[in-house]
């Protein structure tokens, strides 16, 4: 959980202006141009670039970004959500809309049933809108906006999203 939050912060706050260049090699190359030297953050860069498990995850998730980014960016742009927030989905689900966690979170944005209900996603015997790109992204936007309003900063909103259920 902590590594996800740190990587989100890394992508969003340290490299947000260049997030269109989303390869681990690009991030590693930018390190020399940046003034930050935070060892813990570098550990996660190394995890996704040098560790086989991290590299495999990134290499599987990154190509799926192209399948969904236009839809997600359109929704984000409509509500003035920073495009870099898309990487929350990468870390939560690897951009797999059908994935289910052991805790029961489902979809690109890994909504738990209770949170999905709060944000208007339909879950019944016929449909689970957590797996729908359009509906789940709109719900995620509502969730992010409520967290931003509650906490007043993206740093805390992202941490709140990571904690789940508006805790």
PLM regions: where:
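N-terminal secretory signal peptides that target proteins for export/translocation
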Residues: 1-2
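Substrate-binding clefts and substrate-entry loops adjacent to catalytic sites
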Residues: 46-63, 95-102, 110-152, 156
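Short, functionally critical alpha-helical segments immediately adjacent to catalytic or ligand/cofactor-binding
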Residues: 81-97, 157-162
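Short, intrinsically disordered, charge-balanced linker/junction segments flanking boundaries
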Residues: 164-167
């Amino acid at each position: 959980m902590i590594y996800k939050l740190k990587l989100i912060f890394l992508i969003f706050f340290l490299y947000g202006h260049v997030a269109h260049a989303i390869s681990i090699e690009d991030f590693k190359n930018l390190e020399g141009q940046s003034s930050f030297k935070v060892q813990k953050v570098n550990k996660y860069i190394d995890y996704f670039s040098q560790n086989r498990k991290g590299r495999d995850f990134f290499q599987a998730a990154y190509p799926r970004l192209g399948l969904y980014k236009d839809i997600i960016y359109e929704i984000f742009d409509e509500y003035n959500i920073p495009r870099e927030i898309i990487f929350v989905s990468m870390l939560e689900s690897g951009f797999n809309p059908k994935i289910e966690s052991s805790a029961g979170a489902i979809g690109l944005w890994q909504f738990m049933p209770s949170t999905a209900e709060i944000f208007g996603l339909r879950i019944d015997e016929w449909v689970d809108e957590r797996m729908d790109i359009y509906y789940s992204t709109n719900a995620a936007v509502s969730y992010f906006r409520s967290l931003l309003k509650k906490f007043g900063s993206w740093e805390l909103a992202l941490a709140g999203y990571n904690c789940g259920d508006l805790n």
